[in-house]
Amino acid sequence: MVPVVALVGRPNVGKSTLFNRLTRTRDALVADFPGLTRDRKYGQAKLGEHEFIVIDTGGIDGSEEGVETKMAQQSLAAIDEADVVLFMVDGRAGLTVADEAIAQHLRRIEKPAILVVNKVDGIDADAASAEFWQLGMDQMYQIAAAHGRGVGALIDRVLNPFAEQMESEQAQLEDLTNEEDPEEEQLEYSEEEAEAEYKRLQDLPIKLAIIGRPNVGKSTLTNRILGEERVVVYDMPGTTRDSIYIPMKRDEREYVLIDTAGVRRRKRINETVEKFSVVKTLQAIEDANVVLLVVDARENISDQDLSLLGFALNSGRSIVIAVNKWDGLSFDVKEHVKKELDRRLGFVDFARIHFISALHGTGVGHLFESVQEAYRSATTRVGTSVLTRIMKMATDDHQPPMVRGRRVKLKYAHAGGYNPPIIVIHGNQVNELPDSYKRYLMNYYRKSLEIMGTPIRIQFQNSENPFEGKTNKMTLSQERQRKRLMSMVKNRRK
């Protein structure tokens, strides 16, 4: 499982600055679900070799009562989800009563907590940090989040202990799925090699994550799938967050369901309260090959559904959408829901949408057709010759635009990765291509390769001009000839 890091501290100590630096974005997934606070932010982070999830908790105010309230409502929940806590303080402002109260709480928890003194740029860092030792924390790091100073060393120290654990968990998952994790993925394939690799991948179990907001029917759908197949269920705990991996077989195809809601026994299917864990959901997305988002037709698509889809899209996962509780809706309501889905899901127009009833089983069987289609699309290997040929066909049908009097020239294309498919196109002035033409190329590849259910990423690389930045050095005879010509020009002017 991907490690989880929680940022805790009072307001204005730089938690959001560090969060934005780690996630490289200001557009985080905000938890706005029933039972969760509105100001906890979750983001994907990558620094060096480390991939992790970071949680930015809101600030904790200075009064003792406020600390108790805020910690109970928000920060303790984030700490409970986290593997390690970064307790941030302001090196310029110095030690405060709120810092002392937070430290007292952190000393009582049984999780690694590291003191991070921020804003030490331009000042004597050791002198500014000295008073914070009285908080009684075992470890202290000095950083300047705004400029990135010390952040890499901090993350290395925090996450290196989890590397061995992650390797062990990855080995367990590989044993379950019979999947090998090659050190370096092969990108260049002949057409024969591509076909052989495609067949190998189709023999591996598909890792399918069922995600969605609380009470949309995830547990009902999971039990419907398992009940229909009469599969013997066993649990393989991932971490303390207890995502459950459930091997199953359907239509001679093996799957591993990643269940974020927890498999309920039949007698407990009618539970109305379902605990929702953002971290568990994000980790399930990271682990999956295909993500199945369950939406409640009676509530329509929500901003939280869009956030989950956005996270899956950014992770490059294949996507299938199941609109649950479709039975019993009137014709007019169904038409309205379909229009809303068309309007709001334009950014994932490649995803198949199914209208189902998990309770009665209507439409559930067809979900797996789309899951297999999406997995095939994401894992199909395509040779350089095929990708280049499709690119030539696209440019013949619709030429690239002119840029400053010169037409953009696309030379060749090759694979840059799989799951999701990445296509690298080389050419001249390709950074000048407008977004509309990039979308045209992406859609052309999608149609030509019959790719459905997975995002496609196209990367452009400028072909280097070998003479750029070089001067043409003349030979001795050329220099003598140039002098004679210059002399002749001067004599004529006289």
From Swiss-Prot:
A single BP term in Gene Ontology: ribosome biogenesis
GO MF terms, alphabetically ordered: ATP hydrolysis activity; GTP binding; ribosome binding
Keyword hit for Repeat: yes
Residues reported to bind GTP 1: 9-16, 56-60, 118-121
Keyword GTP-binding tagged: yes
Residues annotated as domain EngA-type G: 3-166, 206-379
Listed SMART domains: AAA
Binding site for GTP 2: 212-219, 259-263, 324-327
Transmembrane segments: none
Keyword terms, alphabetized: GTP-binding, Nucleotide-binding, Repeat, Ribosome biogenesis
Residue span(s) of domain KH-like: 380-464
Quaternary organization: Associates with the 50S ribosomal subunit.
PANTHER family: GTPASE DER (PTHR43834:SF6)
Protein family: Belongs to the TRAFAC class TrmE-Era-EngA-EngB-Septin-like GTPase superfamily. EngA (Der) GTPase family.
Function, in words: GTPase that plays an essential role in the late steps of ribosome biogenesis.
The name this protein goes by in its record: GTPase Der
Organism this protein belongs to: Vibrio cholerae serotype O1 (strain ATCC 39315 / El Tor Inaba N16961)
Lineage: Bacteria, Pseudomonadati, Pseudomonadota, Gammaproteobacteria, Vibrionales
